[in-house]
Amino acid sequence: MAKIKKIFTNFLRLLALAATVVAIVFMVTSHDSAQVLNLTFTVKYSNTPVFKYFVIAEAIAGGYIVISILLSFKSLFWRLLVILDMVTAVLLTSSISAALAIAQVGKKGNTHAGWLPVCEQVPDFCDQVTIALIAGFAAAIIYFVLLLCSLYVVLSPIFVVTP
């Protein structure tokens, strides 16, 4: 049974790794140009600090996933995984939340602040950012499930009732 749990959690880690890689690739390659009143402006992820944070957080999570898969076969490392899985889940959640807030402003604008929506002028950029955010959201959900699995592995011996 323990072997099945490890296989399942490593499968989830590989899914999370795939989601983080997709999120990073789509965010880093997102760029577009638009011409407004004979002025050309270019948008790319690196123009926005929140999108940089998103990429860095996804990269940290992806690196941790690789390390955790390599070290998951050592029994002493499993207790530490709970804490690191929690940190990674929180990191992914904070980065996706911040990036979603900025993406919403880019898509809808903010009439109270006088910010106009930009996605009508740069649709390719917004489409790529949307795909990156969906992949990042998937990674965060997978990591939440991983956190629950890690908690179960660590806490299940505590709640075992012996007759």
Curated annotation (Swiss-Prot):
Membrane spanning residue stretches: 7-27, 53-73, 80-100, 129-149
Annotated membrane topology = Multi-pass membrane protein
Where in the cell does this protein reside?
Answer: Cell membrane
UniProt entry keywords in alphabetical sequence: Cell membrane, Glycoprotein, Membrane, Transmembrane, Transmembrane helix
Q: Which residues lie on this side of the membrane: Extracellular?
A: 28-52, 101-128
Keyword set includes Transport: no
Glycosylated residues in this chain: N38
Q: Would you name any one GO CC term?
A: plasma membrane
Provide the membrane-side ranges marked Cytoplasmic in the record. 1-6, 74-79, 150-163
PANTHER family in the record: CASP-LIKE PROTEIN 1U1 (PTHR36488:SF8)
What quaternary arrangement does the UniProt entry report?
Answer: Homodimer and heterodimers.
Under the heading NCBIfam families, the entry gives: A_tha_TIGR01569
Q: Which family does it belong to?
A: Belongs to the Casparian strip membrane proteins (CASP) family.
What is the recorded name of this protein?
Answer: CASP-like protein 1C3
Q: Which organism is it from?
A: Populus trichocarpa (Western balsam poplar)
